[in-house]
Amino acid sequence: MNIEEYRGHCISKKGVTESFPFGKLPDVLVFKVLGKMFTATDISNFEAISVKCNPEDVEHLRETYMAVQPPAYMNKKHWNKIMMDHTVPDSLIKKWIDDSYDLVVKNLSILERHKLNES
């Protein structure tokens, strides 16, 4: 997966916006659904992406896939860093992005989910 495929997959989801919100990290591209982050990457090198995960799955994924590691700057109980080293199939990376999006949507308020469904 290259950066454009990653971006295209993320931005195609309902209610998603993209931004560079971290002033001191100007190359970090963040994708959010209704203002809640579900994935991010450093576009200067695209070495890895971060995705939100169910806490029950975090350790299992790290033990199963060498490319899945704890992230440097995010909560290690809820997020994983996936190295974009071509050892994990693109289809699985897309699934993890989808799971991250779904997890964030699930945790939106009823009003926010209603707003998302209307968009």
Task: Tell me the role of every PLM-derived stretch.
Residues 1-119:
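Charge-dense, helix-prone N-terminal extensions
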